[in-house]
Amino acid sequence: MSKILVTGGSGFIGTNLVDDLCSKNHEVLNFDTKEPRNKAYTKNWVKGDILNKEELLACFTSFNPDYVIHLAARTDLDETKSIAGYAANIQGVQNVVDIINTFPNIKRTIYASSRMVCRIDYVPISFDDYCPPNLYGESKVIGEKIVNEKANHEFVIVRPTSIWGPYFQIPYRTFFDTVRTNLFFIPKNHNPKKSFGFVNNTVFQIEKILFAPKENLEQNYYLTDYPALDLKEWTDMVSMEFNGKKSAEIPMLPLKIASKTGDLLQKLGWKNPPLTTFRLNNLITNMVYDTQSLEKLCGKLPYSLKEGVVITTHWMKNN
């Protein structure tokens, strides 16, 4: 078994990852500013901030990990004025890279970036072709460049797409909550394909990447389920689990009006209205990534779309 340091292990993906790694008897340490969402793993938590290099170095020195999974980041889209608000995604990454460069015993590091290094309707020609839609995406671009240019250790950069499942929060928790209350409507004549990922499959993929022989690895991966899901089919599955009926479809015009209203409410101070023009555009736009290299490495995923929906809705009903 291995010693694995997870930065940001109290977050959504990190919570599920720490749980799975511990269940396999790895020695896991979660370095995070926040307490674990799953209180069973409070004993695995060290409070610390990746922006505090001394704290971070002390953690590495005392734990002396074999592997590192760097998930810690600011992930909201609220900052619109200055990229300095996303210092964790820039200076924080620099701190992690600098420290791991001094630990030659660390076998491999996974750095989590984001699909938002490119806007949803942009198809990059390579992994270093960027088109970020906002400051968050821009901060993740800078973070990737720091890793690629400064890391002198073995690493893989992963870009989680739209991940959902137990312990999730905004925005996909909002999607499930909206479907649950019969307030989610699919636009008529819009049924896009989406490269989304159930979090337990994402954890499976991360672990495959972490422990795979070096010769089997690519330098970058999008983390997503495959094949891409059908949005209507997925929404219907969620609605059936909560409400015993399929989701409704309505014309596009009311949704456009609702999204404009959401934009206005957001400007007036409502942090998270159910629908905005940004979310509506994301909803109706195809988002499909090339998963050939990921499929070759990971093979069949452990959870089907239906199984993921059942697990997630059951968790929501009980939490």
Kindly give the residue locations of the regions a language model identified.
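N-terminal Rossmann NAD(P)H-binding glycine-rich loop of SDR-like oxidoreductase domains
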Residues: I4-K24
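Substrate-positioning beta->alpha
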Residues: F168-T174, K188-F211, E218-Y222
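Amphipathic terminal alpha-helices
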Residues: Y289-K296, Y303-N319
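Active-site Tyr-X1-5-Lys
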Residues: C131-V156
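Conserved C-terminal active-site "lid" loop/helix of NAD(P)H-dependent oxidoreductases
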Residues: V199, D236, A258-L301
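Conserved Rossmann-fold NAD(P)-dependent oxidoreductase catalytic core, especially the SDR/UDP-sugar
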Residues: N95-L135
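Mid/C-terminal beta-alpha module of Rossmann-like enzyme folds, strongest
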Residues: I209-P274, S304-L305, V310-T313
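NAD(P)H-binding glycine-rich loop region in Rossmannoid oxidoreductase-like domains
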Residues: I50-A88, T102, I120-P124
